[in-house]
């Protein structure tokens, strides 16, 4: 008899299996929260840009400034596993950004492309240096190497960085 058919292991496996729907709900809720963060940040940027937009001869804000701020809003997502890919799909589904305004990278590009329906950029540095807001959905044990890789790009482009890493303080992330 194989050891994995032991009744105690079966109970443990069943308990873990029973938690899967709850875990999926938590992932969806986390993604909805991050979508809300992205949308609020986009609105605040948009309102600041419109407030300082040049006015035409009638005193109206220039519409080109409005569309320019929309097209310049780029969301970078590094890490497109369960949470990252769900987040990207929700961003598009809720029309927070257009698909061409999202740049993604992943350790598994083919899976990320399949899950998100977007082209995957191989360079985390490229994403970090060209986005307005950067969402980080990497596993904690990858963070040290990953952070060294993008440190200079973030300091140069100054995106808003949002991390879903558990167990890391803001001070450590900086």
Feature locations, PLM:
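NAD(P)+-binding Rossmann beta1-loop-alpha1 motif at the extreme N-terminus of oxidoreductases
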Residues: 1-114, 119-122, 126
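Rossmann-like NAD(P)(H) cofactor-binding subdomain of soluble oxidoreductases
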Residues: 110-112, 124-136, 140-174
């Amino acid at each position: 008899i194989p050891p994995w058919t032991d009744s105690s292991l079966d109970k443990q496996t069943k308990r873990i299996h029973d938690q899967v729907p709850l875990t999926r709900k938590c992932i969806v809720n986390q993604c909805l929260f991050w979508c809300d963060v992205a949308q609020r940040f986009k609105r605040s940027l948009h309102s600041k840009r419109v407030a300082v937009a040049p006015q035409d001869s009638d005193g109206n804000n220039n519409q080109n400034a409005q569309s320019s701020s929309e097209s310049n809003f780029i969301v970078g997502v590094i890490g497109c596993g369960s949470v990252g890919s769900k987040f990207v799909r929700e961003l598009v589904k809720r029309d927070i950004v257009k698909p061409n305004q999202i740049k993604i990278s992943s350790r598994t590009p083919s899976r990320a492309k399949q899950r998100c329906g977007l082209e995957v950029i191989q360079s985390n540095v490229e994403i970090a240096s060209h986005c307005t807001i950067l969402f980080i959905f990497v596993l904690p044990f990858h963070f040290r190497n990953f952070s060294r890789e993008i440190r200079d790009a973030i300091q140069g482009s100054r995106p808003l960085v949002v991390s879903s890493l558990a167990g890391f303080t803001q001070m450590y992330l900086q």
